A protein has these predicted regions:
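Short, well-ordered alpha-helical packing segments
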Residues: 170, 227, 231, 255, ...
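Soluble non-cytosolic domains of exported or imported proteins
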Residues: 32, 59-63, 78, 159-163, ...
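N-terminal signal peptide c-region/cleavage motif recognized by signal peptidases
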Residues: 10-12
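Conserved C-terminal helix/tail region of periplasmic/extracytoplasmic solute-binding proteins
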Residues: 348-444
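Short, glycine-/small- and polar/acidic-enriched structural segments
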Residues: 16-195, 199-203, 211-248, 418
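Short glycine- and hydrophobic/aromatic-rich loop-to-beta-strand nucleating segment
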Residues: 110-111, 253-256, 260-261
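Secondary-structure end/capping motifs
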Residues: 263-379
């Protein structure tokens, strides 16, 4: 169902940046809890405050969503962080897509079927009768080997070739010594299954639990509420969250075409302002607004899952095995830790994973990674929106990075499951640290 919003023009905001060149907007999203900033900006009137009439429309899958942004049927959308990058470099449909807003950190999990968990759990260390976390793919490796010995493919699902989920699942598997396979676009092979120990394929998020229940896949990596849904249905066990694979990893972004952004620069800034306010609302006062957010998201026009299923992760907990509910306060982060700022280093990490698994077929110099990051990630636009909000008294300067000093690179990040340190200024050196994966001039 589409949602339409009216407006009351907020004079000061529009006077500062300039009126929106386009007021009637249609944004796309996938039914996942991390579309929340769009829903909250709509429901709380933040779009209205910026002089915008907005329609929010659920899309069938990530490909349809991206194609509709490229074709101009959508003004912008909730996107996988890898989508603007993949489109811009031409992996899949080529189109220059940009982002000036990161929608969230974390928010995904990896779930396996009950049958796989039964085989896997005997290898998992236990304390006080419960599995010790994080659960590494090392404990899945003997199960995959058993399938291989019997000549059976070990199949898992992820949501899109350039999704965080694909790269997180691959990262987790490879850290446990399981090769998730390679892409070879230069040879016309975009299955991602060359030399694979585990075969990964695309399944739209809402279909993950049913696809696993049918036995088509044995596990998957997806966002919420589709891991918790497996627990509620009693068909699977989430074994790890992406927070445990890479602490505070960037997840979704708000993407628009470069052509659209150039044509409607003021509109774009007003949209980013509304989304920043929505993200702040979602995290403020130690997540006190989350129960209300869950109620909104459970509506059929948004995520449309049961309140309890969405609340399981959105309110700071996460259930692994049935009854094994643990505190994960940062499972969903929308504003803390400068979550909304589009860091170049985040973009470069995604590009390194595209290279690692062959989506980028040839070696590229470090300068290439930086150039693409700057083409796609636009902290300059974000800074204009943030400064407007500060000037209007809606936000404080400390809510944001110091724009005079910020260079777009996070400090080297150490919190990965394999303890490999990531420094976004040295992408090729980073790739050389991995035992499994392409590096240097490697080519499939």
């Amino acid at each position: 169902m589409a949602l339409c919003v009216g407006l009351t023009v907020a004079g000061t905001a529009i006077a500062e940046v300039g009126y929106p060149e386009k007021e009637d907007l249609k944004f796309g999203f996938i039914k996942l809890t991390d579309m929340a900033p769009l829903a909250i900006a709509y429901e709380k009137g933040f779009f209205e405050d910026e002089g915008l009439y907005v329609t929010l429309e659920a899309q069938a899958n990530w490909k349809v969503l991206l194609d509709r942004v490229i074709d101009g049927e959508l003004d912008g959308a909730h996107m996988l962080a890898g989508q603007p990058l993949g489109a811009t470099i031409g992996f899949g449909t080529q189109s220059h897509i940009i982002t000036a807003f990161s929608m969230d950190l974390n928010g995904n999990g990896i779930t396996v079927s009950n049958a796989i968990w039964d085989k896997m759990k005997k290898y998992v260390p236990r304390k006080d009768g419960k599995p010790v976390h994080p659960i590494k793919a090392d404990y899945l490796k003997p199960v995959v080997a058993e399938y291989k010995k019997k000549g059976k493919p070990f199949k898992m699902g992820m949501v899109f070739p350039v999704s965080t989920h694909n790269y997180e699942l691959r990262y987790w598997l490879a850290a446990g010594g399981i090769n998730p396979g390679y892409y070879a676009p230069h040879k016309g092979d975009i299955t991602g299954q060359i030399k694979a120990d585990a075969l990964l394929s695309v399944t739209p998020p809402p279909q993950m639990p049913a696809t696993m229940e049918a036995g088509t896949i044995f596990g998957y990596c997806v966002g919420e509420p589709w891991n918790q849904q497996a627990v509620f249905k009693g068909i699977g066990v989430p074994v790890i969250t992406d927070y445990e694979i890479w602490k505070d990893n960037p997840e979704k972004v708000f993407g628009v075409s470069k052509k659209w952004a150039d044509k409607y620069p003021n509109t774009h800034i007003h949209v980013i302002k509304a989304l920043i306010r929505a993200a702040k609302w979602l995290d403020e006062n130690n997540n006190k607004n989350r129960p209300e957010a869950v109620k909104i998201l459970s509506k059929s026009q948004y995520v449309g899952a049961d309140y309890e299923v969405i609340a399981n992760s959105m309110t700071g907990t996460f259930e692994y095995e049935k009854g094994d509910k643990r505190e994960v306060p940062d499972f969903n982060v929308f504003f803390r830790y400068f979550a909304t700022y589009p860091y170049y280093s985040d973009a470069i990490w995604y590009l390194t994973q595209m290279r690692r698994w062959g989506q980028i077929a040839d070696q590229k110099p470090d300068s290439w990674y930086m150039d693409i990051a700057k083409k796609v990630y636009r902290p300059d636009i974000y800074a204009i929106a943030a400064k407007e909000l500060i000037a209007e008294g809606k936000m404080k300067a400390e809510d944001f990075p110091d724009f005079d000093k910020e260079d777009g690179f996070r400090a080297p990040q150490k919190h990965f499951i394999d303890n490999v340190v990531y420094d976004g200024t040295k992408p090729n050196a980073y790739l050389k640290k991995f035992k499994i994966g392409l590096k240097g001039d490697d080519k499939i």
